[in-house]
Amino acid sequence: SGLVRLDEEAGAVIATYNAFAGSLVREHGLRIGVDPDSTLITGARAWQIAVRIVEERTAPLPVDRPGAAASVLLALEGALSENLLTVDEAAERLDELVALMEGIGSVRGCRTLVRGAPEALTARLGMLEAVAAYRDYKRRHALLDFGDQIALGCRIAEEAPEVARQLRERHRAVLLDEFQDTSVAQIRLLSALFAGSGVTAV
């Protein structure tokens, strides 16, 4: 399960953030339409899938070599998961950034400051399309990667308040080690589950 029972009588449990989120997905994934028996894939398997996605694309990507493009795809997909963004949300923000760069370029004396930026940003939309294909592949084959665990766990915590209530009753005190306060996904997951209860972060 990814969890290690330290003291059966006291009910103490220790887990990494990913293992804890993964247990939420296994126990409550059906609440958000996720197969609880989904397979957690390794980084190597994720890279193989990403290479396949890249090689099957007919539209050009901003990175030519399949291996390099796959690495960029996975990094981008991980960033979206970390910030709990859908591909559509990221594309919308990218469009806004393109419009901003074009606006700056239209100001007298500022064109050289943003030369090539709108075109480079627009090219990134193709990479977002590849990310969408990668996510669709995982969904169709009931696969999860490590980034999915916390993102899906967060969805469960926010959309199923009864789960949070059960966990707060089960774990009266929570100690967070090496908590990443820059991680949107971690903050939202743990806030949805344990805000207002006995939580200590170190």
Question: Which stretches of residues belong to each language-model region?
Answer:
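General "foldedness" signal
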Residues: R26-V34, S38-T39, D64, V87, ...
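General secondary-structure edge motif
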Residues: V4-R5, L30-G33, R111-V114, E129-A133, ...
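Conserved ATP-driven helicase/translocase motor core recognized via long
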Residues: Q48-L143
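Conserved helicase NTPase motor core
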Residues: V13, S38-A46, A50, G116-V202
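Conserved P-loop NTPase-based nucleic-acid remodeling module centered on helicase motor cores
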Residues: S1-S81, L85, E89
